[in-house]
Amino acid sequence: MATIDLQKKSVKIVLEKKQLTKVTARVGLVLDITGSMRPLYKNGTVQNVVERILAVADQFDDNGLLDVWVYDNEFSRLKPVSEKDFSGYVDREILNNDRLHKFGRNDEPPVMKDVLRKYVTEEPSSYPAFIVFINDGGCKKSIKPIIEASSDKPVFWQFVGIGNGNFDFLNKLDTLEGRVIDNTNFLHIEEIDRISDDELYDALLAEFPFWLKEAKEKGIVREQEPPAEKPKKKGFFSRLFSK
């Protein structure tokens, strides 16, 4: 069985455990591409992250696509990745893309604003957005007003700190005041390529169900109706004897 199939199986188990199998959500991935991340892009770690989060999108997303952004002191909204074209995605769309700004310093607010622009302004939907935000430290406190302002929007920010950088501000997200509801979670994984798929997905989706429940109660996310069953086509004998 291919790796992506095993990852999808792991996601499905976690979704069943957290009673999320009937939930449809849009999934976005924001990747830190500052200078300190260069080795992780070069050694395949980031490609592996893309594939693992794609498995979440495949099980969770309304169209099976994973929306991707990269950011340093600039940001880019990249081509979404799917199960058909995930192989070599990082090399093709990022490392070999000369038009892409990369390996500069970090500046989170602009990319966060673009994420909200896409999911709230450009493509409003009854489906919530689940955003996995990868950062290797030094996340600016200037994201605070963006988190506060988006707390009444159908967007959940799952921050993932990798490595052993400074995550002081991200560690304080749970105590952040001035929000309609708690719309963030922070997960620190020092070596993301060493954590198992089961552990990763369980941790990534730990807080999302609680946010989703409260967001529905407050009318931020609308209740999703189950898809209507398509009428079954009658066979020849069924048509014959129904006359």
UniProtKB/Swiss-Prot annotation:
Pfam families hit by this protein: vWA-TerF-like
Alphabetized PROSITE patterns for the sequence: VWFA
Annotated region (Disordered), positions in chain: 222-243
Residue span(s) of domain VWFA: 26-204
SMART domains membership: VWA
Biased composition (Basic residues): 231-243
Domain of life: Bacteria
Descriptive protein name: Uncharacterized protein YcbR
Organism: Bacillus subtilis (strain 168)
